[in-house]
C-alpha cells in the first residue's frame, strides 16, 4: 500500500497551471498549444507553435519549448515576483539546444484558486541562461510586471508581439551560426543592428510625443 502513488498538492497545482495557461493564451490562432502535465517529458512540458498573422497564414513560424510551474509559494515586493525554481533541468535543456528552438518558463501563481490565478513568463535568453549557476540545484527567478500575462486580449496581444521579437532575434543568431562569421564580423553586425533598433525606438518616441 505504501508504494501506491497518490495525487500530491504539487502535481495538482501543475495540472491546474496547464489548464489556466491554455485558457489565458487563447489568441485566435496565434498561439497553438500542445502542453503536457504529470512529467510526461523529463525536461520540459512540450511546446507551442507561434503563428504571428493567422488571418494571412496559418503556418507556424516558430516552435517554443515550455516548462509550466504552478505554485502557491512565492513572494511579491514592489511589484516584483520571486519564485524558487527547484530544478534546473529545463534551462539546462534549453542551454544545450540554444541554437535550435527557444524556451519559455511559465509560472502560474495560485493556479487552483479560481479567479485569483496569475500568469508570468520568462524567456530563456542567452543572457538569462548565462546568469545561472548550474552547479547549484535551484535558483530564484524574478518576474517584473512586464512579464505578467493578464487574461484579456490586449495583454495576450502584447505577449505575441514579444514573441515576434524573440523569433527575429533567434533567427538572427541562427543565421550568424550558419554563416560561421568571425567574432569581429559578428560583432559589427550586432552593433549595426543595435544602432538600427535604437534609431527605430527614438523615432517611435518622437511620433508618440507628437
Language-model-detected regions and their locations in the chain:
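Mixed-charge (Asp/Glu-Lys/Arg
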Residues: 1-42, 48-210
Amino acid at each position: 500500500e505504501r508504494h501506491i502513488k497518490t495525487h500530491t498538492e504539487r502535481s495538482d497545482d501543475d495540472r491546474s497551471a496547464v489548464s489556466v495557461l491554455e485558457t489565458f493564451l487563447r489568441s485566435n490562432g496565434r498561439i497553438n498549444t500542445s502542453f503536457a502535465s504529470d512529467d510526461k517529458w523529463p525536461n520540459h512540458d512540450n511546446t507551442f507553435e507561434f503563428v504571428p498573422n493567422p488571418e494571412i497564414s496559418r503556418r507556424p513560424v516558430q516552435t517554443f519549448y515550455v516548462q509550466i510551474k504552478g505554485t502557491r509559494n512565492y513572494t511579491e515586493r514592489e511589484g516584483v515576483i520571486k519564485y524558487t525554481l527547484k530544478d534546473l533541468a529545463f534551462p539546462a535543456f534549453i542551454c544545450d539546444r540554444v541554437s535550435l528552438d527557444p524556451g519559455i518558463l511559465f509560472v502560474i501563481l495560485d493556479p487552483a484558486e479560481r479567479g485569483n490565478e496569475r500568469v508570468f513568463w520568462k524567456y530563456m535568453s542567452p543572457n538569462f541562461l548565462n546568469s545561472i549557476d548550474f552547479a547549484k540545484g535551484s535558483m530564484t527567478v524574478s518576474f517584473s510586471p512586464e512579464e505578467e500575462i493578464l487574461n484579456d486580449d490586449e495583454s495576450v496581444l502584447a505577449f505575441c508581439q514579444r514573441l515576434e521579437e524573440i523569433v527575429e532575434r533567434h533567427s538572427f543568431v541562427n543565421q550568424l551560426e550558419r554563416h560561421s562569421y568571425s567574432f569581429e564580423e559578428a560583432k559589427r553586425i550586432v552593433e549595426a543592428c543595435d544602432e538600427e533598433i535604437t534609431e527605430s525606438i527614438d523615432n517611435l518616441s518622437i511620433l508618440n510625443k507628437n
